């Protein structure tokens, strides 16, 4: 079981930007609220909520804040109704982009998202134009030094989908969304604490970006979308070469 993860550089970049802008907490609270509203407040029965809690704790959110968000979503406290929506489009060079949003005003959100696409050489597509290119998975990045054999022994009973080797030699465990929590628990029981983990949308195939100017245009689109208050996550099939990433840093 071997492969290559091409999205790690963008995930890490996005996390750093969100933290820098101070927006990560508001996005995490919304995810906790909606996850508990849709699947209930019991973590054992709600893989999405488990993933949201893990991400909130990793970003140093207090347990009290997490619990309040869960209670709000589960209906124990009053709060504004948030609606989930996904927008699909294409960026420069035909890069496929999925934008996950939570909003209390669809008209405002679609207008903002459309503006970001049009201002950066892209266009907002129709429903289904891009989504078929992506699939939902859980991914857990393991610490350096963990062997594939050790990872397999630790997680086999939890039924991961795959274990892939990333460009830097570290391992990434791939799971279905439903098995994400079980696989993470199995790793922790084996004293293997993932350095990063999430459930997200990943492309079936990638569009290679090999020149710096195109990369800048694509990343500018990502930045503008991520700056929008209603946007939770931005996913893309862009694959930036190591040479391009080095020039951009």
From Swiss-Prot:
The keyword RNA-binding does not apply. Keywords: Cytoplasm, DNA-binding, Transcription, Transcription regulation. It comes from Chromohalobacter salexigens (strain ATCC BAA-138 / DSM 3043 / CIP 106854 / NCIMB 13768 / 1H11). It holds the Pfam family TACO1_YebC_N. GO terms for biological process: regulation of DNA-templated transcription. Belongs to the TACO1 family. It is found in: Cytoplasm. It comes from the Bacteria. The keyword Cytoplasm applies. InterPro entries: Integrase-like_N, TACO1_YebC-like_2nd/3rd_dom, TACO1_YebC_N, Transcrip_reg_TACO1-like, Transcrip_reg_TACO1-like_dom3, YebC-like. One of its GO terms (cellular component) is cytosol. GO terms for molecular function: DNA binding. This is Probable transcriptional regulatory protein Csal_1845. Its main location: cytoplasm.
């Amino acid at each position: 079981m071997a492969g290559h993860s091409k999205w790690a550089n963008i995930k890490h970049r996005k996390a750093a930007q969100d933290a820098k802008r101070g927006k990560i907490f508001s996005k995490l609270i919304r995810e906790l609220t909606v996850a508990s509203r849709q699947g209930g407040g019991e973590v054992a029965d709600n893989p999405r909520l488990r993933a949201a809690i893990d991400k909130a704790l990793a970003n140093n959110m207090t347990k009290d804040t997490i619990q309040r968000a869960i209670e709000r979503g589960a209906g124990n406290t009053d709060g504004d109704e948030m609606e989930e929506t996904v927008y699909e489009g294409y960026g420069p060079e035909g890069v496929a982009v999925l934008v996950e949003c939570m909003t209390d005003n669809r008209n405002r959100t679609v207008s903002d998202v459309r503006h970001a696409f049009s201002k950066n050489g892209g266009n907002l597509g129709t429903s289904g134009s891009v989504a078929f290119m992506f699939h939902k998975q859980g991914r857990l990045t393991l610490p350096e030094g963990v062997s594939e054999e050790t990872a397999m022994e630790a997680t086999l009973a939890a039924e991961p989908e795959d274990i892939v080797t990333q460009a830097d030699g570290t391992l990434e465990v791939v799971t279905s969304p439903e098995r994400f929590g079980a696989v993470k628990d199995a790793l922790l029981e084996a004293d293997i604490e993932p350095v990063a983990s999430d459930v997200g949308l990943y492309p079936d195939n990638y569009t290679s970006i090999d020149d710096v100017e195109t990369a800048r245009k694509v990343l500018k689109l990502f930045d503008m979308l991520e700056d929008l208050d209603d946007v939770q996550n931005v996913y893309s099939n862009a694959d930036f070469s190591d040479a391009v990433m080095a020039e951009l840093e």
